[in-house]
Regions:
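An N-terminal structural lobe/cap that precedes and organizes the functional/catalytic core
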Residues: 9-119
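Well-ordered mid-protein domain cores that form the structural environment of catalytic cofactors
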Residues: 74-180
Length: 185
C-alpha cells in the first residue's frame, strides 16, 4: 500500500487495513480545483491538514462541494516537498477515540500545494493566477505570529517585513506580503 493517487486505487488493501478512502473521485476534484480554485489556505501544517482538510473532505463526501483546497506554505517549504508532493497531496487522518480505538481515513481534499516563495517563479506565478481567478471565494489561515506579526516590541518593523517593504512585490517573503502581492495580480 502506498499513499498516492495510484495506490488508493487498490481499494481492497486499504479496506483490509481498516482505512476508509474518499468516495469521491480525488483526481477529478484536484483537476477541477486547479482549473477554478475556490478556497486557498495559508499555513498547511498538522492542524490544517486534519481539521480544515477534514472539513473540506466532509463537504466533498456529502456532495456539498466539488472542489478541494489549494494549500499555500509561507514558512517551512519542506512541508510541500516532504509531506505533500511525495503523496500526491493525500493525507492520512487518524483520530483517537475515547475508548482507545482509532478511525483511519485518507483525505483527498487537499488538491494542490504551493510554496509562497517569490524566488520560485513557478509557484509565485501560480499564486498570482489563483488570486486572479474569478471563482476564488475564500482565503483562510492557520498561522502563528510568525506569519502575521509586523512589529517588534519597540514598534519597529521586523527585519523580514522591512525587507518586504524595501524589495517590493517581486521579492516578497512574509505571509502578509505574499498575500498582498499575489492578490494584487
Amino acid at each position: 500500500m502506498k499513499l498516492s493517487i495510484e495506490g488508493i486505487k487498490d481499494k481492497k488493501e486499504w479496506e483490509k487495513a481498516g482505512i476508509k478512502l474518499p468516495s469521491y473521485d480525488v483526481e477529478k476534484v484536484a483537476t477541477a480545483t486547479k482549473e477554478a480554485p475556490v478556497w486557498v489556505h495559508f499555513g498547511i501544517g498538522n492542524i490544517f491538514r486534519i481539521f480544515i482538510g477534514g472539513i473540506a473532505d466532509s463537504l466533498l463526501e456529502q456532495g456539498l462541494s466539488d472542489k478541494g483546497i489549494t494549500c499555500v506554505e509561507t514558512f517551512d517549504y519542506d512541508v510541500v516537498d516532504k509531506i505533500y508532493t511525495p503523496f500526491d497531496n493525500l493525507v492520512m487522518a487518524v483520530t483517537l477515540k475515547e475508548d482507545g480505538s482509532t478511525d483511519k481515513k485518507v483525505l483527498g481534499s487537499l488538491t494542490e500545494a504551493v510554496k509562497a516563495q517569490s524566488a520560485v517563479e513557478e509557484d509565485w506565478s501560480r499564486l498570482k493566477t489563483i488570486f486572479a481567478s474569478p471563482q476564488l471565494q475564500m482565503v483562510s489561515f492557520t498561522i502563528t505570529e510568525k506569519g502575521y506579526a509586523l512589529h517588534d516590541a519597540k514598534g519597529e518593523f521586523f527585519p523580514f517585513i522591512k525587507s518586504d517593504i524595501d524589495n517590493g512585490p517581486d521579492k516578497a517573503s512574509s505571509a502578509m506580503a505574499c498575500l498582498l502581492y499575489t492578490s494584487d495580480a
